[in-house]
């Protein structure tokens, strides 16, 4: 059986922010929601859950961000798609947390993701070497996942050969467990905790949810 976690009992995490943000029109990491950048918001939500946080910025040449978290480039430059970021996350985790069996990934554009994300994904591992993936409302959220570091070499060769590089297709190659997260009950109705903010209009909607949520802890 593989260790479910790092030595601290918490896993390392990587925020996936290496996309083009073409629908938003400007980098989503720097977009403001409730007066805070999306990156700061995601880091704030993730910090109590994990052992360490790095940020995948695709072609970024490395170094630290203003928040002090390391920025990591894709390990295979020029291959589009989020799996390039997942691979970079696996390689990074192997370096910074040699005892860890998995790395958690969280995309930059889902500002209300659960505060129990890491604990519930880790707790769902059965044998210990599976991918644990978040679901809500009957839909898979494949970038909210705990990835076993042992499958990094398989991902490395698979993304070089499979042109579509679909995240779901890669998950289907391996043992996985699904973890269902409930909607968040608010006075204004149910909120999908994985609400995705890709466009300026969705950003406005997220701002409205934030105002409604002011009194309710999520
Ligand atoms: N490293 C890396 N990450 C990516 C790439 N494309 C998408 N991602 C990440 O995958 C996640 C989901 O992708 P999208 O929601 O489509 O984000 P996006 O590609 O920035 O936005 P669009 O250009 O509007 O599709 C985001 O967290 C991105 O940062 C890529 O080419 N390389
Ligand atoms: Mg998105």
Curated annotation (Swiss-Prot):
Keywords: Cytoplasm, GTP-binding, Magnesium, Metal-binding, Molybdenum cofactor biosynthesis, Nucleotide-binding, Transferase. The keyword Cell membrane does not apply. The keyword Magnesium applies. Signal peptide: none annotated. It catalyses: Mo-molybdopterin + GTP + H(+) = Mo-molybdopterin guanine dinucleotide + diphosphate. It is an enzyme of class 2 (transferase). Its EC number is 2.7.7.77. GO terms for cellular component: cytoplasm. Its main location: cytoplasm. This is Molybdenum cofactor guanylyltransferase. The gene is mobA.
